[in-house]
Amino acid sequence: MTLVSDHENDDMNPFRVRSRREVIALLRSIGERNQLVRMVINHGADTIVTSILNIDETNDTVLLDCAPTAIMNQRVLDSNKLSFETVLENIRILFNSPSAESCMYENLPAFVIPLPTSVVRLQRREFYRVPTPLTAPVSCTVPYTTEGVTIEVATTLHNISGGGVSLVDEKKLLSTTIGLTYQNCKIVLPGSGLITVALQVRNVLELTLTNGKSINRIGCEFINPSNGTLATVQKYITKIEREQNAKATGLG
């Protein structure tokens, strides 16, 4: 599946940014960092590489660099659907436009498109981990069977990604055998929902706190998570990142 052509689907809604201010900020960051943007035209028949030249907030438009040839430029102008994809800080950014028009920018030919009403942000789940806020701990209940008895072990999350979590086992009750899978683990993601997942132990780190207490930090991978689970996780990651960005910029 090509995300560029499918990002208008409802499945993308958990990852969609609709705030005009956030859309402008994202697109402006892409332009200021000179990130190349892939433009798909004619429903995937043609692709060109462009860049964001300017955001015109007064007219709600985005100015883009032209294609290298007149023929390709005309194909862009003739297209009734334009899809865009780029990467910003390991986050895939997707947006679209119904059409483009030609214009001049700093005495050079350019394209102008309407400011997108929304932008999709997709984390690269295999790389991106978000530390959970200390002010709103994320709980994870892990069913653990030992000697024929199943107990519910309460843990908290140190971090989370689209591929797994890092558990903090303060009482060191869980087995840390690499490859062991815990079924039906329940994670409560504040503001996003409850997920039930299978967690497989991938690594373990024993830590000694300043008070001398020893704890285990267990890195776990999601095993066959559902699309709904991944959507909920991504929704939570996006929420946390927005809150962190708001604090960093003094808006939170």
From Swiss-Prot:
One of its GO terms (cellular component) is bacterial-type flagellum basal body. Gene3D superfamilies: Electron Transport, Fmn-binding Protein, Chain A (2.30.110.10), predicted glycosyltransferase like domains (2.40.10.220). Keywords: Bacterial flagellum, c-di-GMP, Nucleotide-binding. Its main location: other. It comes from the Bacteria. The keyword Nucleotide-binding applies. It is found in: Bacterial flagellum basal body. This is Flagellar brake protein YcgR. The gene is ycgR.
